[in-house]
Amino acid sequence: MEANQEASLFLVKILEELDSKQNTVSYQDLCKSLCAQFDLSQLAKLRSVLFYTACLDPNFPATLFKDKMKCSVNNQQSKKIMVAADIVTIFNLIQMNGGTAKEKLPMSCHKVRKKEASFESCRSDTEVCSPTVCEPLNCELSERPFSRGYPTRQSSKCRKMDCKECPQFVPASEPNFLLGVSKEVKNRAASLDRLQALSPYSVASPQPCEMQRTYFPMNIENEPMSDQDSLPISQGIKETFISSEEPFVVQSCVQKRNIFKEDFHNLMTVSPSLVGTTNKAEEGHGEPQSQKELHKPPFFNHSFEMPYHNQYLNPVYSPIPDKRRAKHESLDDLQASTYFGPTPVMGTQDTRRCPGRSSKQTPWPAKSWSLNTEEVPDFERSFFNRNPSEEKLRYPNSGSQTPNFSGPDRHPVYLVPKDQQKVLPAGYAVKPNGLKSKEISSPVDLEKHEAVKKFKDKSISCTSGQHSSDTSSVGTQTEQHVLDPPKCKDLCTSGQAKYGDRHAMKQSDDDSEIVSDDISDIFRFLDDMSISGSTGVIQSSCYNSTGSLSQLHKSDCDSSPEHHLAKITNGVSSGKGDKCNRPENVHHSEEELKSSVCKLVLRIGEIERKLESLSGVREEISQVLGKLNKLDQKIQQPEKVNVQIDLNSLTSEAPSDDSASPRVFRAHSGSHGPKLENSPDWCCSDASGSNSESLRVKALKKSLFTRPSSRSLTEENSATESKIASISNSPRDWRTITYTNRMSLNEEEIKDAGPANNKDWHRKSKEADRQYDIPPQHRLPKQPKDGFLVEQVFSPHPYPTSLKGHMKSNPLYTDMRLTELAEVKRGQPSWTIEEYARNSGDKGKLTALDLQTQESLNPNNLEYWMEDIYTPGYDSLLKRKEAEFRRAKVCKIAALITAAACTVILVIVVPICTMKS
């Protein structure tokens, strides 16, 4: 007896050491402290006790520590460190309970008494007394609080006794490893599953509750003293755990895990009930409720105290006949967090509760049972008419017995009261077609329906042509609105007016009676969201010429007179919403989807009609290219031109252009917003003034977008040709050409500018011309362009004579880095017609080829960019050809010399010789 008490005190000391240093000392320091204070045999005993206690939890990895308990190490110090490390590890694993339940576990420090005293006080231990009645015991019973999250309780009517007679307790400092709480009838391995809802959700007022105690083995003499013998269950532990009175047997780890292969899922759930404080008259001498119920056999020896006041284990919330409960209660959390809500199971939906969430209101309201609001359960429908005072969660408190209220009242508040749902967020449009008429089942609902209809009438000015689905979505939360049914046919009115096929928009009555399941509702919801956008309002898809969304005040359907007529008729009949028959309400979602499809088809046809204006683009482009070729030919013609541009002729042409082409898109050169006038076709916006447009692009635009006008392409381009022909031939004036043509074309497009703007524009254009007209003496010398391009284009020879294989004379190697060196040797170039005539001495040499050379200086031409390409293969080919030419030349000279010599010999020598003879 003394040895047992000392052993218990020793284990108390070790566990208190672990408890006090767990959160303040590191793992290594805790192991060192255990090794320094205790012997190997004591540590081995504690490890075996902790191991067998931890094996009560089926989640405990027993095989990891079984090999360690069998291992034999010769060095005692190493073995001691290993045992201490195992103790700390098992202790931490027991508390963590898989890592997920640590925050939910009660942080109580219970005392475990030895078995000899437990049977003496088995009856009296179950009686609950207040702490003030009991005198403190001498064995640290009053020194340590029983709970950090619970009200302080003592387990029995305390008897005045000395410490020698006092039963010894082992404190389970964070003692959740001692609690095998999950009690199944068929000796299921004890689990810590039920503990996760105890501590953080304690009821505010102290509630005496039933004490179930799990025995903690303390017979140290009967334990094996060696570390190697500690794995098998000794006789003392067997006597401790196995008792004929109790149906609990400690099994091996393999047997514990084999229970999962059996039919343990159908075991009945034993749920200890709460004992209310109104039973205080019975508490001193009565038995708890669980002992009165004979169909609940006890599972544990009544020697370790474990208070239950878990809402989850309350039979009100956990009915015994429910055999479909999830194996792990965390599945309820998973179901409650899914988007479309939990799945109804056999009508027990209002008794399903998330574990550990009983004393909290659910932070998110319950998700909709289905997107089809016809299938709302009855208990949720009862929330529509409840008062806010009835919506408080009622839990047992110190002054009342646990009420067995019904399922709908027992549920948390899932929905906001309907009076608060009339005010919607600003970004969400009111959809006057929400709830079906069969759900408007009470006068209160009808009054709210009328109020919402009035609210809809006030906001009719912002009504769009498309309404959303039955729920307005805020995040993933679906809120239900009692809204106006008579608008159910308003959606497909425009489609019916367009196509005239009213029967295609409806289904038969047989199809309407079929209730849609969750999957079809999900897809219908996704279709509506994809068509309508997240707010359920179809954006107007009328795009202007720049591709941006035009700011129209009406949607596509509102602009049609048919839609206005249907809207008026529907508005007249909106007061008869309660008389709207049921098939129309059932057809509502299908008609809404079909009307959206009809709108989409109409929009596609609209776009196709707009695209028809591009059918003749190819022919017009060919005509434009022909005109541009004529322009090039006119530029190449030699003629005397003036340097200054005759702007008066240009201004005289501008009004005629404007009057002749009323459909041209006009915009100020500095304006920012494009304006659509009376052009039915696509019009390209020139809002920025088109300062970067080239001449050809402008001509192309003008030929494309003035096609419906009365002017022909020839008349249209004649002004452009005359303007281009009146420009100086100077390469520096090419910028003037593009600039003036750009400004003149913009001038034709300016109609709203007025005479003041026109004068200002003329002044600016003249200043720009003067800016480009620089005297020759102030111009910087540039690299001259020889006849390379002219010869390359017009020469019949494949290799022009100006192409030489030498680096300095070949224009292929003309580089910007070589320009400075080339200018020193080549002298002053001629950049104007006068300089060219003076330098060449012949004014008749100004030909179309010269203008073509200057054409190559125009950056708008492809030759300007293709001229200076470096081609080393071409250079080697040139050198080879030049060598062949030189060789042929030498051969010809040699042949001529030989022929001359032969001729001299034959003509002179032979007659002389003949004459001498």
From Swiss-Prot:
This is Major intrinsically disordered Notch2-binding receptor 1. Interacts with NOTCH2; this interaction increases MINAR1 stability. Interacts (via N-terminus) with DEPTOR (via PDZ domain); this interaction may stabilize DEPTOR protein by impairing its ubiquitination. Residues 576-588 have a biased composition (Basic and acidic residues). GO terms for cellular component: plasma membrane. It is found in: Cell membrane. It is a single-pass type IV membrane protein. Residues 914-917 are extracellular.
